[in-house]
Amino acid sequence: MDWILHLILLLGSPYLTVGFVNNDEVQTLTRYILRGPSRNSGLEWLEPLVDDFGHRMLCRKSLEDAIDFTVERLRQDGFDNVHTEEAPNMPNWERGEDTVTLLEPRNLKLNILTIGGVDPAKVTAEAVVLEDYDLINTTNVNGKIVVFNQKWTGYYEDIKYRRAAKEIKALGAVGLLAKSLGPFSIGSPHTGGGSDEHLPAASLSLEEAELLGRLARRNKTLKISIDIRSKNLPPCTSRNIIFDIKGSEKPEEVVLISAHIDSWDLGQGALDDGGGMAAVWQAMKVIRELGQTDKRFLPKRTIRAIFWTAEEHGFAGAKHYYEQHKNGKEKFYFVSETDQGAFKPTTTKSILRFMGNTTQRAKMQEIVQSLKRNDIPISVQEGDKQGDVQSWADDGVPSVQYVADKGADFYFYFHHTTGDYLNIFEDGDIDYTAAIMGTLAHVLSNQDKW
Amino acid sequence: MDWILHLILLLGSPYLTVGFVNNDEVQTLTRYILRGPSRNSGLEWLEPLVDDFGHRMLCRKSLEDAIDFTVERLRQDGFDNVHTEEAPNMPNWERGEDTVTLLEPRNLKLNILTIGGVDPAKVTAEAVVLEDYDLINTTNVNGKIVVFNQKWTGYYEDIKYRRAAKEIKALGAVGLLAKSLGPFSIGSPHTGGGSDEHLPAASLSLEEAELLGRLARRNKTLKISIDIRSKNLPPCTSRNIIFDIKGSEKPEEVVLISAHIDSWDLGQGALDDGGGMAAVWQAMKVIRELGQTDKRFLPKRTIRAIFWTAEEHGFAGAKHYYEQHKNGKEKFYFVSETDQGAFKPTTTKSILRFMGNTTQRAKMQEIVQSLKRNDIPISVQEGDKQGDVQSWADDGVPSVQYVADKGADFYFYFHHTTGDYLNIFEDGDIDYTAAIMGTLAHVLSNQDKW
């Protein structure tokens, strides 16, 4: 149990700080998680959440029950300031028994998932298959169902296909079938948020988007019928979950680590974003436990964790929280999220997607160097996709989103599919993510200034 | 186009034979496929079969239509002896809207596929989760639904779980839920053949078998309801497809390469076994084309290709053919099948699963050496699973089943799932399989004796 020996040595010696990162502090925290008493605790914490409540769709009982269950556990853990804050007017969309059927050249019920937010609609029309987005500008799509059969180039590059409703509707299209956003499939379409336009729209499995592509290349006329029963319902109120480790010197300066609790209505939302929640919880639990053993470990600034609601619906929960707090007396010093797979980083292709200025970036580099010294390979990369913490990032608060190497590709095997289950995580995945989030939170809560 | 140069050189020079394998002959054939005019032709041949007819379930119109389409194409190709032979009394099973629902500890419609051959049944009972088959002998399963949540160790090792109905019924079990037979899943259960017993039985997705396993380990009582609507119907008659390249010296001695045309009622049966068919067709086409260019390339024995029906139902089509022909005047000299993924071999973990005596095995080794010299890594391995050609293998006819390295594991990502689509094949997969099957057929059709 080398972490115990290390802790004893640490308690007997002053922290040795080079730059603003104290490597002993990072070592204590990461060893406590990866090889010490906290090992596997995040995964164990996650199990009853996803197994007992299942997926947690916004405006559904399973989400609100899961929120209650989580708050109760956080109170038992003894965190500071455990509470929920209401997020009113949340989008309420319910999936129905939707069908999309290829009628010609042969009858085949297609393997689809309706895109979130679409209202009931029926349409039968000829389909045109486009292998690239820009072809909408040179192809007659008027009166047609547009089928996108793009090559996977990455989620953020390809999301325009799923969100094309408004643009293709303006060109006269009567329906949208977008190839699912992922690099690999076993008959597994992906859902996700779409446009507000009431154009019938669904994601096709990779296999069947490619089938339609091949049929079109052989000059077959494709006739497709779309029958959407899904619908929007009156808005609901949901809740964000907040819990703190109160800062000893600057309690009103907040270092934020976060993940989201809501999910789509498929699988059990373990990957997206139960694993993120578990890593955030584990990081918080470890900082609290180490602080109880050694008061010097307690943070100077407040470390706050938030489990957002309504992430899957345009970050609606986080945006509401931001609006409520942006003019408050608390100052957000740093914000972060983990929502692209709480995976173990195995190469320095694992990144902290960072927004901030040059000085701040240099500090991130120091943190990353310290993580590397503790066998956590990772690098800093500029990027502007910060998910739920985007509002603060846009405000100039330094921000990070953790993306493991597996988060760039493997994550999208399962994202928004029926395959989003706890077994995606391998031993250590959540531990490593917790070690990264905990290190960020702890180091930044204690530095003098940005 | 080095194959043309090679062909010219070959035509001008006598075959150089070391042992019984003529390496020039193998090189001509493999180059013609892998880098010559036949490149990609198998994959192109397969496309309309799977895209225009879809899956091809026994006793369904799509199978018989696909048989007619295939026969017509073979006739146009000019093969000898193109015909079908009826296989009567074939099992006729139709999947219904089957549901399996977890009632306690929470309500969840489980992600299942009924096991083939099961008749309508309804049962609600407590479930017991077993992580290993042998636990049926030490666990009280009387009145219970048995859920198997085994670790994947391989298809042939684990198939006992799917076929456990008879045995667990004898112990008083009232239902069977078997974890799907595969190493990896994206919410993708696998179907397959089961037992004849009328015990309600279905395959669970990996994810949900593991979910039930975790709930049981946390001492939750599991209550499950099974409602099977699938049913057996009166038997039907289907057809095997036979086509030859007639032997020039020993036409009544048959060298057989084969694959099966029927599939389960999911996906499009491209992997299982459209790819096998395409490779067999491509091998036959190439041998015929090379023989037209150079008469010396024509086989001395008859090379026969068969596309079996009813493979998915206990090899019923092949067994019928065997019974009809075992006492005929034709002598089966060698039999083979490709039905475990028509993939490119990338390592010598790719095998010819071989049954035969020591002398025959030595000859297989020579063929394999020649394939290796032509950049096709493969090895010979003893094994007794020869699929549709098992009857001949059991009779002592030397036999081979081709299993690429990807056939051991990756194949079972898709096997009997909704993900069995043409896109599984990468560039070259079917070409390489055709090169192997073609080499086996051609070399063995021309050797003096075993």
Language-model segments: which ranges?
Chain A
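N-terminal signal peptide
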Residues: L10-N22
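Noncatalytic luminal/extracellular "stalk/propeptide" segments of secretory-pathway proteins
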Residues: R31, R35, E47-I145, Q150-W152
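Metal-dependent peptidase/peptidase-like ectodomains
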Residues: N107, D265, W308-F412
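His/Asp/Glu-rich mid-to-C-terminal helical/loop segments that flank catalytic regions of hydrolases
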Residues: K285, F410-W450
